[in-house]
């Protein structure tokens, strides 16, 4: 069974794409578990009318030890973060930078979800900003790409992407800002002019992208059993 929902925008709000102010951001973490892992770096770039108007970046001192595997991936060591602010200390700067602008992340279900869990952990409400997942948007806009990692999408738009600098929050946020600017151009070229339009877009190759979900089906009688075998 394939999940038909391809959510691009969370916390939907009407906003014109033509003069959109957005914040692209990225996190580096000690791992993938929102319950057990911590943020080690935050990076964000703010764009208005296609031009950068601000950026923010900081290493974050996690409570958890950074493993060698994560250091190999992000190039962030335990020594790098020993004098960095904790996430509790840095949260006010993140929220001040976001304001109420649209935020963009590549695989927002992870980055926004992780950040929301951290906010709740320290007594803050979850983000109410419209949050755009550029990964899901790429599925819809660029159905013929062979891969949808940020580097693949950047190279499609001829935006330089250095694999050695990848997996650093400030670098990925900067690349994502350029990618999303190009996506906005493509959206308007295709007749989409508002943030609210993105969720309504079709995903041509949905069956190739979304992982199948496990489902249990109960047949109550022989007729149901016969019909069930027609599904598989």
What are these language model-derived features?
Residues 23, 97, 108-109, 113-232:
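Phosphodiester-processing cores and adjacent nucleic acid-binding clamps
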């Amino acid at each position: 069974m394939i999940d038909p929902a391809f959510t691009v925008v969370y916390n939907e709000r009407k906003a014109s794409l033509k003069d959109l102010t957005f914040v692209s951001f990225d996190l580096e973490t000690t791992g993938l578990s929102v319950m057990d892992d911590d943020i080690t770096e935050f990076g964000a770039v703010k764009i208005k009318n296609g031009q950068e108007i601000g950026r923010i970046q900081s290493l974050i001192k996690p409570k958890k030890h950074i493993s060698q595997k994560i250091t190999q991936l992000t190039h962030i060591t335990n020594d790098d973060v020993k004098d960095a602010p904790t996430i509790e200390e840095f949260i006010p700067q993140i929220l001040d930078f976001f304001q109420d602008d649209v935020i963009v992340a590549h695989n927002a279900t992870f980055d926004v979800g992780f950040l929301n869990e951290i906010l709740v952990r320290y007594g803050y409400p979850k983000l109410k900003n419209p949050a755009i997942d550029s990964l899901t948007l790429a599925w819809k806009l660029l159905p013929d790409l062979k891969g949808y990692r940020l580097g693949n999408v950047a190279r499609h738009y001829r935006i330089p992407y250095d694999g050695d600098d990848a997996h650093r929050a400030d670098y990925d946020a900067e690349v994502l800002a350029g990618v999303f600017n190009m996506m906005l151009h493509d959206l308007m070229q295709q007749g989409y002019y508002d943030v609210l339009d993105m969720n309504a877009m079709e995903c041509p190759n949905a069956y190739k992208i979304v992982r199948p979900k496990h489902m249990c089906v109960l047949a109550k009688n022989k007729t149901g059993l016969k019909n069930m075998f027609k599904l598989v």
